[in-house]
Regions:
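Generic structural signal for well-ordered, non-membrane alpha-helices
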Residues: 77, 81-84, 104-107, 126, ...
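Short, solvent-exposed positions on alpha-helices
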Residues: 77-78, 97, 119-123
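N-terminal alpha-helical interaction modules that lie
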Residues: 1-78, 83-90, 137-191
Length: 191
C-alpha cells in the first residue's frame, strides 16, 4: 500500500486544506491522469466489450487501488478527490463515470459525518444510491453491473450504503484527530 497522508482533511477542522494551503499534504503536486487517455482509447467502445476490459485495467491501476485504500482507511476527502480524477477520465457522463460519481458521494457522506452534518450525510447517501443503482442488478444488466465492471464487489458497496443510511447521530465522529474511520464496512475488489 502506498503511504497514506498525515491527516484526513475535514473542512472547518484544524488541518490545512490539502491543495490550497502551503502546509497541505497535496500542495504543489500535479496529478497525472489516473488512466492515460491512450490506454482508455484501447478499450472497445461497445459497452459489453468495454465492461470486460475495464475491471482488469482498474485492478492494475495503482491510483484506483489507492483510492480504495484511502476510503477504507478513513481518508474520505482524499478518496473523493482521487475518484474525481477517474470520473473525469471516464468521461463524466458515461455509465461507468456515473458509477464512480456514486462512490464520490459515498466519500462525501463520510466527510459530512466527520463534520457532524446529518442532512449532508442523508443527501449524499441518497444521491449515491441513485447513481449506484440496484447493486443486485448485475445479472440483469442494470447500473449495478458497473460495480463488477469497475472491479468492485457489489455487496461491499451495499454494506457501506446500508451503514450510512442507518448512521445514528449519537455515533457522530467529529473528533479532530488526524484520521477517524466512521464505517466498519470496506469497499473491496471483486474476486
Amino acid at each position: 500500500m502506498r503511504a497514506l497522508p498525515p491527516y484526513s482533511y475535514v473542512p472547518g477542522h484544524e488541518h490545512p486544506h490539502p491543495v490550497t494551503d502551503p502546509l497541505g499534504h497535496l500542495y504543489g503536486r500535479t496529478h497525472a491522469a489516473p488512466i492515460p487517455p491512450e490506454t482508455l482509447a484501447q478499450l472497445p467502445s461497445e459497452p459489453a466489450s468495454r465492461c470486460q476490459g475495464l475491471p482488469s485495467l482498474l485492478a492494475t491501476t495503482p491510483q484506483w487501488r489507492y483510492a480504495l485504500d484511502l476510503f477504507n482507511e478513513g481518508f474520505y476527502w482524499e478518496s473523493h478527490e482521487a475518484w474525481e480524477a477517474f470520473w473525469h477520465a471516464l468521461g463524466r457522463t458515461t455509465s461507468e463515470a456515473r458509477f464512480v460519481q456514486g462512490l464520490i458521494h459515498l466519500a462525501a457522506a463520510c466527510v459530512k459525518i466527520r463534520e457532524g452534518r446529518p442532512e449532508g450525510v442523508r443527501r449524499h447517501t441518497q444521491r449515491a444510491r441513485t447513481l449506484l443503482g440496484d447493486l443486485g442488478a448485475a445479472s440483469r444488466g442494470g447500473v449495478g453491473a458497473h460495480a463488477a465492471t469497475l472491479g468492485l464487489a457489489p455487496e461491499s458497496i451495499s454494506n457501506v450504503i446500508r451503514e450510512l443510511e442507518h448512521y445514528r447521530t449519537e455515533c457522530w465522529h467529529t473528533s479532530k484527530t488526524p484520521v477517524v474511520r466512521v464505517l466498519s464496512a470496506d469497499l473491496r475488489l471483486a474476486g
